[in-house]
A protein has these predicted regions:
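Short FAD-binding loop at a beta-strand-to-alpha-helix junction that anchors the flavin cofactor
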Residues: 257-274
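Phosphate-binding beta-alpha-beta segment of Rossmann-like dinucleotide-binding domains, i.e.
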Residues: 79-136, 297-301
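NAD(P)-dependent dehydrogenase/reductase Rossmann-like domain
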Residues: 271-273, 277-310
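Rossmann-like adenosine-cofactor binding region
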Residues: 42-44, 165-257, 273
Length: 310
């Protein structure tokens, strides 16, 4: 019997896939596998029996991948399982970055009951915002989420530029032919009215949005970050917001300093917070775990090569 330890709440739809050969719980010891979402494992004492860790999500920054590799522990993720959920929220943010919806909502709450309608008509002009139709959107990173965002933006009438020097063949096949292929990220910075980031957090991508890159962008650019907080230099983006260089910054990863900065919208990491996404991620993670433990097959591992039984 295999022991599978859950370190976060995992969707029941995924857990139901385990049969009687598996003992699953959050208080097990000497586990063969770990299912995790956001729990940090950098200080976790891995038992000798541990063979695999499956993250119900794409990013693995909460897992010490190098340590796992040294110990022969296979680390899985679930690329694409939450792509639609994140795409939908990015599209929502795209509209919110352009139209003055949130400031308008907050303003309406302050109006007196008497002559409410007249007050609305008199003051609504202060919340004018541009349409996204015909505007240029730059998508940095063309993985599952980036491709979905780019394709959806094309359908909304935007002129879309994509940049990803490491785009996979599978992603390239799915990308709309109407997406312009930016030769460099600098080209994208200079051309686009809106920029959305969809790359992993690595030493190379840390602070990729900084004073230097912001200076290349159009005045009044709108920036979306639904990938990782470390991609954007907080101090530099705040200065750009205060100067008007950046018209609006919307992020799924924030800080108190950002929350208190005008023209910033900070969400509480809601990108994958849909029941469908949680089900998809859990189902994929569980299937990867079972296939590895029972058959030795490796798919979607971030530290070991793909191995699939013919």
């Amino acid at each position: 019997m295999y022991k599978i330890k859950t370190l976060n709440k995992i969707s029941e739809q995924g857990l139901e896939i385990f049969d009687d050969n598996y003992e699953v719980g959050d208080d097990l010891e000497h586990e063969d596998g770990i299912l995790v979402r956001s729990a940090k494992l950098h200080d976790y004492d891995f038992p000798a029996e541990l063979k695999a860790i499956a993250r119900a999500g794409a990013g693995v920054n909460n897992i010490p991948v190098d340590t796992c590799t040294e110990k022969g522990i296979c680390v899985f993720n679930t690329p694409g399982a939450n792509a639609n959920a994140v795409k939908e929220l990015v599209l929502c943010a795209l509209i919110l970055s352009s139209r003055q919806v949130i400031p308008g909502i907050e303003w309406v709450k302050t109006l007196p009951a008497d002559d409410f309608g007249k007050a609305v008509e008199k003051g609504k002009s202060q919340f004018v915002g541009p349409e996204i139709d015909g505007k240029k959107l730059g998508v940095i990173g063309l993985g599952a989420i980036g491709v979905n965002v780019a394709n959806a933006a094309v359908k909304l009438g935007m002129e879309v530029y994509g940049y990803d020097p490491y785009i996979s063949v599978n992603a390239a096949w799915k990308l709309s032919k109407w997406v312009h292929k930016a030769a460099t990220v600098e080209e994208l910075f200079k051309e686009c009215d809106y920029i959305t980031i969809h790359v992993p957090a690595t030493p190379d991508t840390k602070n990729m949005i900084n004073k230097k890159s912001l200076a290349m962008m159009k005045d009044g650019v709108r920036i979306l970050n639904f990938a990782r907080d470390t991609l954007v230099n907080t101090e530099d983006i705040i200065k750009a917001l205060k100067s008007g260089k950046v018209a609006r910054y919307i992020t799924d990863f924030g800080s108190k300093e950002l929350v208190e900065t005008e023209n910033t919208v900070v969400l509480p990491h809601l990108g994958a917070s849909t029941p469908e996404s949680e089900d998809n991620c859990a189902t994929m993670a569980v299937k990867e775990m079972i296939d590895y433990l029972e058959n030795g097959n490796i798919q979607n591992s971030v530290n070991l090569p793909t191995v699939v039984e013919p």
